[in-house]
């Protein structure tokens, strides 16, 4: 129950998965993973299938995990989240590391054209959905 409290879902302890939103299901998955007391957590696009309103719920839990010192490897297109939470950002293309470094450097002043192109397209998509 403590782990459900940690992810803000103690009130849903008796709920079935079909009764939970996508964001709530993701937070339950995080609680289940935390039950194993991991030293490291892997997230592969944890918000990609969520409605935009629910993305914040999951990112808030992940932000709290980071603040508590959890080591996380996160594959994401949530660039602002990465900028705020990550110690290191790695940009990959076709399985190859193109650029890595501090978030401010990689996301704010990328050195490689492929990184620049990706970030420009991503910003354009967010501005003109």
Regions found by a protein language model. Name each.
Residues 104-129:
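C-terminal boundary and immediately downstream tail of ABC-type ATPase nucleotide-binding domains
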Residues 1-94, 98-103:
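ABC family nucleotide-binding domain
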């Amino acid at each position: 129950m403590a782990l459900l409290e940690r992810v803000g879902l103690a009130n849903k302890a008796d709920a079935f998965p079909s009764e939970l939103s996508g964001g709530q299901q993701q937070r339950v998955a995080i609680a289940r993973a935390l039950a194993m007391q991991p030293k490291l957590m892997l997230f592969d696009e944890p918000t990609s299938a969520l409605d935009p309103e629910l993305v914040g719920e999951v990112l808030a839990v992940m932000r709290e995990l980071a603040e508590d010192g959890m080591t996380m490897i996160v594959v994401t297109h949530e660039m602002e989240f990465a900028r705020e939470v990550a110690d290191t950002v790695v940009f990959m293309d076709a399985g190859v590391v193109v650029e890595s470094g501090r978030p401010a450097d990689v996301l704010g002043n990328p050195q490689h054209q492929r990184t620049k192109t990706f970030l420009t397209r991503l910003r354009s998509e967010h501005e003109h959905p």
